[in-house]
């Protein structure tokens, strides 16, 4: 009985090995999407952007319609906003008590304020909100990580404290990076009039934290 079972197992192993050797790597996606096809599918020069240029005031008036004044009024509420600092203990609290709110609350308030200021500037287009947007961008760039404390366990070192040697892409960092990317796209010329180092720093942070990490 044991001999018969042994022979059966050997036969199954041989059958498996034979089929493994016979397996053909098809690479269907790689064959279908060669370099030329991918190149022809790419939309270069930001031609895919569906929104008006910053200087196209008529375009933004049409795009925002009756909501234009609402966006401006909302942004005005943050002209004197005091940017929140996410403290080291705010991150550590997730490991101590399991509370993620203490870190996410100031982080979320900053992101919301920055978004409101950005949309107000896009709606008005007079540069009135630029300095405060720069403040928000600077606060974001100075953060060690854009990821939420509850997701920092994805770091190789683990834990809930942000490492400056490794970046994590989660919903928090992805959402903020998306917002900062639009800010860079539309307001880089305005930033450069104030100081070119502002947009240079923002571009660097997006590259290192998101693009390099993803790639």
Where are these regions (language model features)?
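Aromatic-lined, polymer-binding surfaces characteristic
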Residues: 57-58, 64, 104-215
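Low-complexity, Ser/Thr/Pro/Gly-enriched N-terminal "stalk/linker" regions
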Residues: 23-95
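Generic hydrophobic/packing signal
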Residues: 18-19, 71, 179, 206
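Generic structural "secondary-structure junction" signal
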Residues: 93-96, 148-150
């Amino acid at each position: 009985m044991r001999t018969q079972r042994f022979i059966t197992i050997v036969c199954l192993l041989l059958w498996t090995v034979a089929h493994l050797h016979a397996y053909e790597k098809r690479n269907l996606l790689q064959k279908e999407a060669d370099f030329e096809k991918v190149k022809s599918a790419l939309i270069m020069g930001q031609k895919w952007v569906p929104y008006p240029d910053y200087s196209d005031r008529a375009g933004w008036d049409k795009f925002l319609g009756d909501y234009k004044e609402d966006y401006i009024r909302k942004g005005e509420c943050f002209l004197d906003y005091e940017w929140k600092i996410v403290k080291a203990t705010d991150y550590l609290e997730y490991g101590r008590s399991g509370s993620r709110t203490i870190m996410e609350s100031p982080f979320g308030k900053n992101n919301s304020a920055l978004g409101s200021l950005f949309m107000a500037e896009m709606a008005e287009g007079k540069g009135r909100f630029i300095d405060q947007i720069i403040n928000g961008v600077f606060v974001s760039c100075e953060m060690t990580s854009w990821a939420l404390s509850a997701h920092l366990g994805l770091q190789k070192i683990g834990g809930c404290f942000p490492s400056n040697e490794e970046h994590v892409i989660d919903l928090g960092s992805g959402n903020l990076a998306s917002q900062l990317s639009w800010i860079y796209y539309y307001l880089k010329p305005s930033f450069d009039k104030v100081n070119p180092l502002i947009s240079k720093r923002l571009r660097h942070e997006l590259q290192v934290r998101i693009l390099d990490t993803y790639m």
